[in-house]
Amino acid sequence: MRIVGFGVVGLVIGVVGGGALGCSSGGASVACHAGADCASGVCQSNGVCGPVGPNDDAGNPLDSSAGQDTSTDSQTGDSSGLGCTANADDVITAAEVPLKAGLHATYRTATNITFDTAGQMVNNARVWDLSVALPGDQNAIVETLPVAGAWYASSFPTATYATKLSASSDLLGVFRTSPTALEILGIVSPMSGGSQTNVSYSPPAAPLQFPLQVGAAWTTTSNATGQASGVPVIFSDKYDSQVDQKGTLKTPFGSFAVLRVRVVFTHTVGFLVTTTRSFAFVTDCFGNVATVTSQANESKVEFTSAAEVKRIAP
C-alpha cells in the first residue's frame, strides 16, 4: 500500500521548513543581490540584507505561536534557545537549524509543473529561481505541532514535533531532532478513528544528518508497520541522501545562500517498488526554505517535471 506524501518527499524534507525563530546576522542591513552577499545568508525581496528576527521591521517568516519574547536572543545573535546566528560558512550544523514545536511559516506551493532542478550558472555560481509565480500557486501556513496531548503521543514518546508532509495530503510526519540528525519516527493522521493512520519506522529514517556540507552522503533503510487508513500495513522505505550542490535560491521571500540535499526515496511494498526524487534547499537559521519533488519513478537526477514545488513566501 502506498502512503501518499510519506517521508521527506513531501518536505524536509518535512524538515518542514523549520527555520529559526530569532535569526540574527549581528549587523546592520545592507544592499544585496543574493544571499551570499549577506552575513545572514538572506537577501530579502527588497534587495536588503537582514538581520531577520521576530521583532525586525523586515519581518520574520517563522513565528512562535507560543508568543515568547525573543528580542534579546535576536539582538545578541545568541545561538542558544530560540536565537540563531548565520555564519555563511557552507556548513550547517543542527544548532543552525533550530527546530521545535510551535513554529509556523508561509509556504507557496504549486503542483504538477515544469521546473528545471539544474538551475543556472551565473558568474560561476549555481542559482535556482523559485521567486516567480508558478501555475496554480497556493499559499499555506506550515506549522510544527506539539506531539504532547495528540492522540498518537504515546506511540512516539521521544518526538520533538509533528508537521504536515505534503500539500496533497493531510498526513503528518512525526519528527525527532538531535545534534546529529533530523529523524522521521512515523506517519500519522491528524485524527484518530476507524480510518486512522499510525505507522512507525524502525529504525527511524534520517532525511537530514548534521553537519551538512557539500559531499556529505548517508543512507537509511527503515521498516514500517502499523495502520494506514485503518488497514494494517508492512513496508520498507529507503532514503539515499547527499548534499550535492551549494548556491543561491531565489524565493518570493528573498534570496538565500543554500546547500541542496538530494534525496532518492524508495518505497517498497512486497514486490511493488516506487522511487521518488526530491531536492531540499537548506540554509542557516531558516532550515528548509524550499523543496522540489519529482513525479513517481523519475529516472533523471536533474528533472523538469515536478509533482510539487514548495518555497518560503512572505
Segments the model singles out, each with a brief description of its role:
Residues 15-84:
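Ser/Thr-rich, Pro/Gly/Ala-heavy low-complexity intrinsically disordered linkers and tails
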